[in-house]
Amino acid sequence: MADLISYDDAIDAAYDIFLEMAPDNLEPVDVILFTAQFDDRGAAELVDISDDWAGHVGFDVDKEIYAEVRIGLVNEENDVLDDVFARMLISRDPDQKFCHILWKRD
C-alpha cells in the first residue's frame, strides 16, 4: 500500500471537492449562506469516523485509510460546527481515490 496522504491534505481535498460540487447539491440559499459567512464562521473539520458509513457506502470502512470531514458553519456562541453542509468520507490512499458525500437536506 502507498503512503497515506496526511489528514491536512485530506481536509484540503475534501474542501476542494465540496466547493466544486456544492452548487449542484445544496439549495441555492445554503450556497449563498455558506459563501457569505465562510470567512467568519466556516470550517472544514476532521472528525472521528461515524459508524453509519458502512450503510451508506456498502463496505466496512477502514478507519486507518479513510477520513471523515465535516464542512459547514460554526456557532459563534459555543464554537461548535453545528450547521453541517456536508459530511464527507475520503480515502487517504492516493492509489485508491474515493469520496462519498452526505449533503445537507432541509
From Swiss-Prot:
NCBIfam families assigned to the protein according to its UniProt record, in alphabetical order: PRK05094.1
Protein name: Putative double-stranded DNA mimic protein VV1_3059
Record Gene3D superfamilies: dsDNA mimic, putative
Family annotation (Pfam families): DUF440 (PF04269)
Superkingdom of origin organism: Bacteria
Protein role: May act as a double-stranded DNA (dsDNA) mimic. Probably regulates the activity of a dsDNA-binding protein.
Similarity comment text for this entry: Belongs to the putative dsDNA mimic protein family.
Source taxonomy: Bacteria, Pseudomonadati, Pseudomonadota, Gammaproteobacteria, Vibrionales
